[in-house]
Amino acid sequence: NSPALAASETGSALLAAEDVALRSGHPASVVRLAGIYGPGRNRLIEQARAGMNVPAEPAQYTNRIHRDDAAGLLAHLLAQAEQRELLAPCYLGVDDEPAPLHEVVGWLQQQLGVSAQADGPGSTRMGSKRCSNALARESGWVPQYPSYREGYAALLD
């Protein structure tokens, strides 16, 4: 439960919007969705296919959520609110498994039958976070795709 820190203007704007919602005097909860992937959102698959090369050290932990799980979490929380259930101020919309980017890309490349290329595109990702969906799960939400493996496998079939 570390506090959210904004590393960009966009992040600052999002935190300010969350603050406005939570201090509005109206019932509100914030849902922070991690990297959304799914049908039509295949950027990492395309980067892996192009030979993306991600060093193992230092590990860049990433969090993601399948599009269907993101929608399912929102629907679940809205249904709870409709039943007058008390919601937490903030939920993290992530799958069960924060993973190092090199592991995710390596797994995708293995599934695609391609290899990382020495001159392939590199990661421009900054930061490294391990987020937990424990609070969302405690509310009764269960992701259909608990890790990147199940989610991306469904896209690659």
Residue ranges and their predicted role:
Residues 124-157:
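C-terminal amphipathic/interface module of NAD(P)-dependent oxidoreductases
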Residues 47-57, 114-118:
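A short C-terminal helix-loop "cap" of Rossmann-like NAD(P)-dependent dehydrogenase/epimerase domains
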Residues 14-18, 42, 98, 102, ...:
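Short, surface-exposed alpha-helical segments at coil->helix boundaries
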Residues 1-6, 36-40:
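Conserved catalytic-site region of short-chain dehydrogenase/reductase
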Residues 5-29:
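Active-site Tyr-X1-5-Lys
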Residues 30, 64, 98, 130-131:
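Short aromatic/basic micro-patch
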Residues 13, 30-36, 43-46, 56-78:
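Substrate-positioning beta->alpha
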Residues 71-73, 80-127:
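Mid/C-terminal beta-alpha module of Rossmann-like enzyme folds, strongest
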